[in-house]
Regions:
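Juxtamembrane transmembrane-helix termini in multi-pass membrane transport proteins
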Residues: 36-103, 159-176
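Flexible cytoplasmic inter-helical loops of multi-pass small-molecule transporters
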Residues: 125-138
Length: 207
């Protein structure tokens, strides 16, 4: 290989200079390609977990239909930041801590079951009340708490940090969290915006 490089050198006085120059140009391109592939993989995972139907997104849809898009932004922001906090704590070792405290993990598991049961009951009894209590738009803290009782959020946080955060160190975990924040915020906002056109229909009094 070294003979081939010396034979193809563009600088006869410097053996292998052409080969080294070629590799020097290829290495940044290869690094850029790998970085882009990683970012696309992160974004694809975050989008798949954020945009698909779930309790938080259904609440955003119902809130948009009942109260409009602007009033639903508190829930959107609260749910986003609540999940990002969960994601960061998973990256800092929350999952390993819960494995050492089975009682805490069991408490969270049953809290999620009760929460999903309550959501199903609200949908069954009165779908117009799914987004809050007494016709009030869901608050910031309501959205944040929902994520901590949402099994889908726990699954996404554990899988995401396991795939992209743990092996890459603090920098990659922070990059993943920042990217997830933007995608999660936009995804939940899309559900709230999708429900807002229905607001006028819900406000029409029955004849």
């Amino acid at each position: 290989m070294s003979g081939y490089c010396r034979g193809r050198s563009q600088f006869p006085s410097i053996p292998g200079a052409g080969c080294r120059l070629g590799w020097g140009l290829l290495l940044p391109i290869r690094a850029l390609f790998m970085e882009t592939s990683l970012l696309l993989s992160m974004a694809g995972f975050a989008l798949a977990m954020s945009i698909t139907p779930g309790p938080v997104n259904l609440v955003a849809l119902g809130s948009g239909a009942r109260h409009g898009f602007a009033a639903s932004l508190r829930h959107v922001v609260g749910a986003t930041l609540g999940f990002i906090l969960l994601l960061l704590l998973m990256g800092l070792g929350l999952g390993a801590t819960l494995l050492q405290w089975p009682a805490a993990a069991e408490l969270l598991r049953w809290g999620g079951v009760i929460f999903l049961g309550w959501m199903a009951w609200q949908l069954l009894v009165d779908s117009s009340r799914v987004e809050g209590v007494d016709g009030v738009a869901p608050s910031f803290w309501y959205g944040a708490l929902m994520q901590w009782l949402n099994p889908k959020a726990w699954l996404a946080a554990s899988m995401g940090m396991g795939a992209y955060g743990s092996a890459g160190g603090v920098g990659q975990a922070a990059l993943f969290s920042g990217l997830y924040l933007v995608i999660c915020l936009c995804s939940i906002a899309c559900w709230a915006y999708a429900g807002s056109p229905l607001q006028g229909l819900l406000l029409v009094p029955p004849r």
